[in-house]
């Protein structure tokens, strides 16, 4: 009988902070051919957007960014470290963002997906 590694589930979420941006950018650069800039993340945090880190223990494995205004939420970014993809972490992040949107009174939630991002299309389908 062989032992197989079990996928790691997110153990907690916490709000993203400015001091997390180096780690966030490292994941962003590994994950996307056209990544957000650190300035975009700074602007999101400065504007008070909901920005959350997904953690396994103390290790950042992904994040999500959500804007909420006028009872509408817009999922701006969901990212999982490529080394951690395929374990359901993106789905956990998306569910957390949906709960956050509802908690803040959003009645509608929008997101856009690039046709070149099959992982996201599969997640949102």
What are these regions (language model features)?
Residues 75, 109-113:
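Conserved hydrophobic beta-strand within the GNAT/NAT acetyltransferase core sheet
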């Amino acid at each position: 009988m062989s032992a197989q590694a079990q996928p790691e589930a997110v153990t907690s979420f916490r709000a993203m902070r400015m001091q997390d941006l180096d780690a966030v950018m490292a994941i962003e650069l590994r994950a996307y051919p056209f990544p957000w800039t650190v300035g975009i993340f700074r602007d999101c945090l400065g504007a008070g957007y909901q920005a959350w880190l997904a953690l396994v223990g103390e290790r950042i494995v992904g994040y999500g960014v959500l804007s909420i205004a006028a009872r509408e939420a817009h999922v701006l970014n969901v990212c999982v470290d490529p080394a951690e993809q395929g374990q359901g972490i993106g789905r956990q992040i998306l569910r957390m963002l949906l709960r956050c949107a509802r908690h803040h009174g959003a009645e509608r939630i929008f997101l856009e997906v690039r046709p070149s991002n099959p992982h996201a299309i599969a997640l949102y389908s």
